[in-house]
């Protein structure tokens, strides 16, 4: 049987969410075909998580570990790190050198999609509509709140250019809030993206390809009790209503699912992805973000959409492992 590393953790605030996703993948993977191991990557080290809180250090020279005197090598890596080094391409580059196949897109695609500002500008070249934005590359970059509002108006969304799970994201409704929002975003990343706020219905759509098929998952409608779908709404029960399939017209559904499939190809994605959108009051489709390693916890969007489609996560994981 293949030894599968379910690679979790990471160096960002999303580490805890990654661990929950890894547990769900571990529970769902077909153990009659694969030997799954949860690998935890942190700044303190790389380890395989054993029973009774035991850990086995990873040999980074060949991505293996020793168990009961025997060297265990991995045949496949299912990457479930949200943020660096999994979502930005660093881990993919390491695995490419070792010739170990993995579940998601490669270095170039990950680099493009992890940088929200670059990804949005790249996709605009294909006609994808996104919010107007300004990128701040470093803390020392000086830009006045007045200039920001003059270009983008109010309200604004201020967020890390390279993060997820809504860490460091602020909705700004007043000029006095801008500088604090920028500082909060810089605490989560090296760049800050300031976007004009787009009112409307927030939705998200999952998609995956294997050797034999391509599947667009049902769309989920997101109704947050907060001003927008922030971290509190994402991970606190009762703060959000998630409706799958979304209560939108068939025409909009078809357009969004088709656009999702196109974006998958345009960015060179692999495995399962999820793309977030806003449907404006004028029924315009505005892309928010491409997630190349979406959350896989029991309550995450992708597992919800898989269930709504009448599909089986165990079978999908097998298809992905065998297709790459």
UniProtKB/Swiss-Prot annotation:
Known cofactor(s): Mg(2+); Mn(2+)
Binding sites annotated in the UniProt record for Mg(2+) 2: 289, 291
Binding site for Mg(2+) 1: 276, 289
MF GO annotations: ATP binding; D-alanine-D-alanine ligase activity; metal ion binding
Protein's UniProt name: D-alanine--D-alanine ligase
Function: Cell wall formation.
Source organism of this protein record: Azobacteroides pseudotrichonymphae genomovar. CFP2
InterPro entries for this protein: ATP-grasp, ATP_grasp_subdomain_1, D-Ala_lig_Van_CS, D_ala_D_ala, Dala_Dala_lig_C, Dala_Dala_lig_N, PreATP-grasp_dom_sf
E.C. number: 6.3.2.4
UniProt cofactor note: Binds 2 magnesium or manganese ions per subunit.
């Amino acid at each position: 049987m293949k030894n599968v590393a379910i690679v979790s953790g990471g160096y960002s605030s999303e580490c805890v969410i990654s661990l929950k996703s890894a547990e769900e993948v571990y529970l769902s993977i077909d153990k009659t075909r694969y030997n799954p191991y949860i690998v935890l990557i942190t700044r303190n080290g790389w380890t395989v998580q054993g029973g009774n809180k035991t850990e086995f250090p990873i040999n980074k020279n060949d991505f293996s570990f020793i168990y009961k005197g025997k060297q265990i090598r991995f045949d496949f890596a299912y990457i479930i790190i949200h943020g660096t080094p999994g979502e930005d391409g660093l881990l993919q580059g390491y695995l490419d050198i070792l010739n170990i196949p993995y579940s998601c897109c490669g270095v170039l695609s990950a680099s493009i999609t992890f940088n929200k500002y670059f990804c949005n500008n790249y996709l605009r070249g294909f006609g994808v509509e996104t919010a107007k934005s300004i990128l701040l590359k470093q803390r020392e970059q000086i830009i006045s709140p007045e200039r920001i509002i003059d270009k983008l108006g109010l309200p604004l969304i201020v967020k890390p250019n390279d993060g997820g799970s809504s860490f460091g994201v602020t909705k700004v409704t007043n000029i006095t809030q801008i500088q604090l929002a920028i500082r909060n975003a810089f605490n989560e990343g090296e760049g800050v993206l300031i976007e004009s706020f787009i009112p409307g219905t927030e939705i998200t759509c999952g998609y995956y390809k294997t050797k034999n098929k391509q599947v667009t998952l049902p769309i989920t409608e997101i109704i947050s009790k907060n001003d927008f779908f922030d971290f509190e709404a994402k991970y606190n029960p009762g703060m959000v209503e998630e409706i799958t399939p979304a209560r939108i017209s068939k025409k909009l559904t078809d357009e969004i699912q088709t656009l999702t499939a196109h974006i998958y190809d345009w960015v060179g994605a692999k495995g399962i992805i999820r793309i977030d959108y806003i449907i404006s009051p004028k029924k315009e489709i505005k892309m928010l973000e491409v997630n190349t390693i979406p959350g896989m916890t029991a309550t995450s969007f992708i597992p919800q959409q898989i269930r709504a489609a009448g599909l089986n996560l165990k079978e999908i994981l097998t298809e992905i492992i065998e297709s790459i």
